[in-house]
């Protein structure tokens, strides 16, 4: 196991949930259910309300691979929108182009999806993009660049991920043409997150 996987493994154990949605971390949690450095029943000392909020915020931060500044800005945007702030926050994270590439099965992980976008492999509405943080809207279309080598890579990823995760109902994936259409924003019950978004809202609201 390389250093990056070890670091991810420690995060999964710290949070007690498989935030990276990969089978190997489910196995790790079964084998080592305690947080790093903790053993037996004393998994964690009593956590303050602030500590709980911080943990939920960190879960989302590491799940989606965003920086502190990015998450703060996403929260500010979610608060400006109509509706429930926590729901808006998660929907904005889900509609990031790197996350859509991941959800569509074009990448085996979100980190891999960010790499794919950064390398210019993805087209957005016919134009090459290299910014993983772009927020997609209804009727946006993303497509794999017209190169046989790239298409072969993505098709291989689709094959690997097809049995591991279900496609979201708010996107339409054409596996033959390797494109994805955003049909609408996701609703809260369509977002498979392991974090408590209300605690994240409370965390940022106290610092606004």
Curated annotation (Swiss-Prot):
HAMAP family in the record: Ribosomal_uS4_B (MF_01306_B)
Record-linked SUPFAM superfamilies: Alpha-L RNA-binding motif
PANTHER family: 30S 40S RIBOSOMAL PROTEIN, SMALL RIBOSOMAL SUBUNIT PROTEIN US4M
Phylogenetic classification of the source organism: Bacteria, Pseudomonadati, Spirochaetota, Spirochaetia, Spirochaetales
Pfam families associated with the record: Ribosomal_S4, S4
Protein name (record): Small ribosomal subunit protein uS4
Keywords for this protein: Ribonucleoprotein, Ribosomal protein, RNA-binding, rRNA-binding
Top-level lineage group: Bacteria
GO cellular component, one term: small ribosomal subunit
Disulfide bonds: none
């Amino acid at each position: 196991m390389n250093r990056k996987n070890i670091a991810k493994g420690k995060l999964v154990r710290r949070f007690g949930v498989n935030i990276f949605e990969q089978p190997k971390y489910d196995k790790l949690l079964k084998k080592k259910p305690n947080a790093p450095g903790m053993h037996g029943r004393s998994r964690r000392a009593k956590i303050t309300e602030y500590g709980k909020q911080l943990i939920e915020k960190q879960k989302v931060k590491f799940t989606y691979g965003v920086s502190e500044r990015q998450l703060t800005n996403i929260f500010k945007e979610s608060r400006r929108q109509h509706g429930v702030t926590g729901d808006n926050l998660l929907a904005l994270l889900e509609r990031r182009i790197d996350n859509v590439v991941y959800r569509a099965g074009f990448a085996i992980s979100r980190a891999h999806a960010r790499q794919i976008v950064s390398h210019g492999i993805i087209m957005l509405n016919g134009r090459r993009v290299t910014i993983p943080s772009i927020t997609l809207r209804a009727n946006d279309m993303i497509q794999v660049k017209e190169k046989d080598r790239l298409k072969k890579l993505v098709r291989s990823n689709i094959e690997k991920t097809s049995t591991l995760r279900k496609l979201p109902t708010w996107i339409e994936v054409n596996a033959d043409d390797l494109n994805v259409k955003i049909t609408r924003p996701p609703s809260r019950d369509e977002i498979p997150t392991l974090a408590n978004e209300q605690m994240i809202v409370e965390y940022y609201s106290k610092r606004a």
